[in-house]
Amino acid sequence: MRSSGVLMHISSLPSPYGIGTMGKEARKFVDFLDKSGQKYWQILPICPTSYGDSPYQSFSSFAGNPYFIDLEILCKEKLLKKAECESFPWGSNPHYVDYGVMYNSRYALLKKVYARFMKKQPEDFASFCEKEAEWLEDYALFMALKDAHGGIAWFEWEKELKTREQKALSEAKETYADDILFYKMLQYLFFKQWWALKEYVNEKGIEIIGDVPIYVAGDSADVWANPAQFYLDENLDPIDVAGCPPDAFSADGQLWGNPLFRWDEMKKDGYSWWTKRIKAMSKLYDIVRIDHFRGFDSYYAIPGTDDTARNGEWREGPGMDLFHALEKKLGKLNIIVEDLVFLTPSVLKLVKDSGFPGMKVVQFAFDSREGSDYLPHNYPTHCVVYTGTHDNDTILGWMNTAPKASVKFAKEYLNLTKEEGYNWGMMRGAWASVGDLAIVPMQDIIGVGSEGRMNTPSTLGGNWEWRATADQIDNKLAKRLYKYMEMYGRVRKDVKEEAKEEAKEEAKEEA
């Protein structure tokens, strides 16, 4: 079934309070998707971000980002006052998140919420904490201890806490009981709002595609609470870390720094950590997109003490053994795989054997590094087509910065014109393709340049900040988008049927 969707992270939604949230603007965006005939809303990971603000480097794989808790909903619940929200600074530019300002203002307000919340705890708060205890207990304690240590990484804590000695943990739970409850409350509020939003999305006939990074951050509750699952030495420092090897465009390669999984240990317990993770993410989202899928076939391991990726080596991953174990425990998995880099025959075989759809990126079709596999006429039907991902420049940004020969080829191949708009022409290439699903970033629909780029890999600062404003997402844009969906057979089925009924009614009235 041909379908389409839009990539728009929650942080990028309009908001008067510095960052997109799960409130009314999220519902307005869902209405926009509905009116334009979309089937899917794709978002980036919604876990709590750490110091670089990247959703791919989180303090927990299971927790939700407190930044996305909607303040107006908290006002309606009498946990905040609007005047309090308006009294804090939220950044000076409505098109970007100011994370420094965001952190200070948001947490000061959430402390006020906590004081009121604890006076009259909701009846289901205790049951929420009990139900989610398997990850929530470690996460809340981890965050409370981070605060107590001035934010330093857990592997720099005193030995008894670093190694999770039972006596030290018991004392910490008593000493920081109030802080632990604060972090549990944040998760309660997050998931209460998330499930309400997801229900609204699904009632419209729309599904959420959520990103799951293959690796977790070293400074996370995941690693602190499960050290045996990762390649750590006796001091709990990473023996090897993740990254990508050097190539013609990066002499040093990419040093990501994430600790690597100890796949041999994971196999012994039936991949229980991965089972818990995929089970949780499959509940959170309707479809899971796994980032860096090739890492399950083989992964690049770099010595933990190195400062470049030059001395790394490829090692064998778990392959289909992991996915057989997951499907045995969880049933059929709804997964999209990111299969865009270092594609060897064995990686391609793993993608094929998994049965999961892979990805095609239209921008790559005109990039000499990637070649013709990404040209739309070469796509299989069983794939997800993107104009670009969160790591790409926007279409208009690419048109202004790519080599002239690449831009010329794109113009000729897709018949790009200024009259239609270069962004609409390239999106048309994705929608017109035979790929079952086509997804385009909201920045390309709005038509912004490089200022709307979400992330530039291997750079620090200026990433994950872009935001839309309410006036950029309107009915006129939805109607234009719908026409393309109609033209290329991608209108969501129920919307198509509603449109037919409306046309019949209009014909009767005219008669």
Which residues are covered by each model-predicted region?
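Structured C-terminal cap/extension of enzyme domains
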Residues: 447-500, 511
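Conserved, well-ordered alpha-helix/loop/beta-strand core segments that scaffold catalytic motifs
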Residues: 183, 188-215
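Alpha-amylase-like alpha-glycosidases and glucanotransferases acting on alpha-linked glucans and related
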Residues: 9, 15, 53-191, 216-439, ...
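Outer-envelope exported proteins of Gram-negative bacteria
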Residues: 44, 207-209, 213, 287, ...
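N-terminal regions that are enriched for targeting/export leaders
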Residues: 1-11, 27
